[in-house]
Amino acid sequence: MTIEAGDIVLRDFLAQDIEKRITWETTETEWQLWDAPWEYEGVSEEERQRELDGYIADMQRWAERFRDLPDDVPRMGFQIATRAGEYIGWCNAYHIDKDCIITPEEGLCTIGISIPERSARGKGYAYQALIAFIGYLRQQGVDDIYLQTWSGNERMIHIAQKMGFAEHRRKTGIRTVRGKSYDGLTFRLDPERYAAFCRERR
């Protein structure tokens, strides 16, 4: 499945994406300073390798699953590529409960985005991808949309607020990153502010 949106394309995961993902996990890792960095701190090389091996196995299963998946089967995320075909990142959705904790059960639809490819940043691709993804979720009947980040990720906060997300819940001091304490933030999309944002981009 593919969704064309401005300068980017949202598409399913492909087997050819695995090599780039491995690069992002092993050498081009700057993005990990901002995308849930607490998950990477204090992890030994042995643990990293074990996690990478499991990750590669997961990605192989993803590629197999999406290879023949009909377009009418709902997706919980997409890969992001430029119109020229360069793979630059991904966006996804997951559920949180009323306390803003991730849950495997049905809950509040929460979205996230990662663009590890540094050369692709600052070009508006994140906005285009999120607009397209929100549009897709709305087509699936999802009207109430949330977004989570942490108080040290100023770029993500700026994107969220500009798009019309309003702070919904702040959990003070629950994240420790590089020795400092940060808040966990949950935003909720304000439909009117989001509509105004979209009108301004036309």
PLM region descriptions:
Residues Y40, G152, R175:
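Positions that flank functional sites
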Residues M1-R118, K180-R202:
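GNAT-family acyltransferases
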Residues P116, L147-I157:
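Conserved beta-strand-loop-alpha-helix junction that forms the acyl-donor binding cleft
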Residues K98, Y146-T149, A166-D183:
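Conserved catalytic-core motifs of GNAT/GCN5-like acyltransferases
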Residues G122-Q139, E154-K162:
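Conserved acetyl-CoA-binding loop-helix of GNAT-fold acetyltransferases
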Residues S119-A120, R175:
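PDZ/PDZ-like domain micro-motif
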